[in-house]
């Protein structure tokens, strides 16, 4: 992982473009914020379930990774919900869905794929709309989440590639 001299933004980085074959359903910034909260809520619940499965399967370090990313998704939810509440007072966050973990290697791949989607498709699409609408707060929280999701994907792939290393 490389450190940078400046915080990446859509203005100074080249990996904020929206993919040509985007599968993200894009709405207004408010709709996108709500979609992000809903998606992150599901991801957080899924990662908590994956942590429990990893622990049960004897992968304690990977369980901690899933616990940490579940907690990180809660930070994204809080930031996004905070911007929603400024636009729509009284907004209530969605309830976390039921989630279940499966084999740890498959959970890592599914997690990485979800994070790659968010960092390469969903958040760039949402950032573009926030910029068009002039919503700097939404642009900031979407950008922060986008950058974090890239790190999560990298961590999941590293764990997947090293799942049978003797340290876990």
Give names to the regions the model predicted:
Residues 2-168:
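Non-heme di-metal
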């Amino acid at each position: 992982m490389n450190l940078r001299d400046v915080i990446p933004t859509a203005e100074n980085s080249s990996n904020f473009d929206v993919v040509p074959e985007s599968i993200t359903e894009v709405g207004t910034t408010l709709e996108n914020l709500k979609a992000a909260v809903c998606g992150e809520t599901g991801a957080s619940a899924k990662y908590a379930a994956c942590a429990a499965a990893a622990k049960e399967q004897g992968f304690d370090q990977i369980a901690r990774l899933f616990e940490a990313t579940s907690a990180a998704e809660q930070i994204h939810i809080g930031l996004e919900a905070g911007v929603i509440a400024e636009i729509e007072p009284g907004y209530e966050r969605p309830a976390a869905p039921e989630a279940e973990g499966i084999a740890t290697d498959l959970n890592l791949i599914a997690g990485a794929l979800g994070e790659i989607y968010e960092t390469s498709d969903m958040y760039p699409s949402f950032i573009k709309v926030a910029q068009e609408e002039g919503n700097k707060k939404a642009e900031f929280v979407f950008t922060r989440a986008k950058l974090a999701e890239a790190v999560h994907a990298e961590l999941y792939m590293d764990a997947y590639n090293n799942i049978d290393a003797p340290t876990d």
